[in-house]
Amino acid sequence: HTWLRRQRQMCIRDRLKGSCAKGLLIFVCAMKGDDENVVNALTQKISKLRIFESSEGKMDLTLHYIGGEALVISQFTLAADIKKGNRPGFSSAANPQDANYFYELFIANLKRIKIPTQQGVFGASMKVELLNNGPATFWLDSNS
């Protein structure tokens, strides 16, 4: 599962760890049942999404076209199940070893297709700042 936002900066222990001037903040959450095919498909989908505004004000440009970059953050809380009770459950999240593998694979895939990419630290507590244009936020998963 991947959640896209447009402005991005991330700090760990009050030190700037990553930022990007133009592009996407991508929150990544691996779910049970995800595999390399899901990671590869999401990488390709993100590279082809026409979500940046053209001169006509329409979402028509890709991340590559605008010369954008990605800041990728692991975010297992996207797997939260809040259907019952008031405390979220995370039983649908992939185990940490698989999640870290898929997170690193996703980042490697972005770099392989020439998207400049910075990343957070898997499992770390981070302060993430964003300024969201639009606002425009997109949810992508294996069904996208």
Residues of each region from the PLM?
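Compositionally biased, non-globular sequence tracts
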Residues: 19, 139, 143-144
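Single conserved hydrophobic/aromatic residue that forms the stacking wall/gate
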Residues: 1-12
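Glycine/charge-rich, flexible interdomain linkers and switch-proximal surface loops
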Residues: 55-70, 118-130
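Short beta-strand/turn micro-motifs at beta-sheet edges
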Residues: 13-17
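C-terminal edge-of-domain segments
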Residues: 127-141
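Compact, glycine-rich, soluble single-domain proteins
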Residues: 19-67, 77-92, 96-108
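Short, conserved loop-to-beta-strand elements that form functional interface hotspots
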Residues: 100-129
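Residue-level signal for inorganic ion chemistry
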Residues: 42, 73, 136
